[in-house]
């Protein structure tokens, strides 16, 4: 497809579910090197692992233990009930080489010759993307959506031009195009 040449890959993440009472009641979400949510429906969520080059969709005890270790570091002496049973889910993040999201018109990877600026690179008409949030989707998604809406409607952009360019999906092609190399983006998204 038109996005298959973007330099994106998938990164495994495992979230652990802990029964209410397995950790002290929290008035808020804790977040540092990991996160721990308040109980919702009797369950706390804790996580998540960040497993590069790992396509295993199954829950693993080792990932669960990693999450529990991170929860212990968040809580300090407040405690965690030992031996929480293995429960949770596995998901896969979409990640780019610089870990910034890709927001805007998707580039056409057809060889183009020399290009000095992002706006000089060809795009697929009418094809836009909001992807590659890595583990920061909750932070980036609202701003990225506002940026894309402004681009689509021709409205003033909500960000400075340098940040808009840092998020442009064609940014990975620009260096090659400046050197007059054939424009070919990085490896496609890995699939299991």
Predicted regions and their residues:
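C-terminal catalytic lobe of FAD-dependent flavoproteins
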Residues: 77-192
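Active-site substrate-recognition segment that forms the wall
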Residues: 1-125, 187
């Amino acid at each position: 497809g038109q996005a298959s040449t973007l330099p994106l890959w998938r990164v495994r993440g495992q979230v652990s579910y802990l029964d209410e009472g397995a950790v002290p009641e929290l008035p808020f979400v804790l977040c540092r090197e990991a996160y721990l949510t308040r109980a919702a429906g009797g369950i706390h969520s804790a996580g998540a692992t960040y497993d590069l080059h790992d396509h295993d969709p199954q829950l693993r005890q080792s990932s669960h233990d990693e999450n529990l270790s991170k929860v212990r570091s968040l809580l300090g002496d407040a405690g965690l009930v030992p031996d929480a049973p293995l429960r949770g889910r596995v998901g896969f993040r979409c990640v780019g080489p610089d870990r910034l999201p890709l927001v805007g018109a998707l580039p056409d990877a057809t060889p183009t010759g020399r290009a000095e600026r992002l706006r000089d690179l060809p795009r697929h008409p009418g094809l836009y993307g909001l992807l590659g949030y890595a583990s920061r989707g909750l932070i980036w998604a609202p701003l990225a959506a506002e940026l894309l809406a402004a681009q689509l409607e021709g409205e003033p952009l909500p960000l400075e031009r340098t940040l808009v360019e840092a998020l442009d999906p064609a940014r990975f092609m620009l260096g090659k195009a400046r050197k007059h190399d054939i424009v070919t983006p990085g490896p496609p998204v890995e699939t299991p």
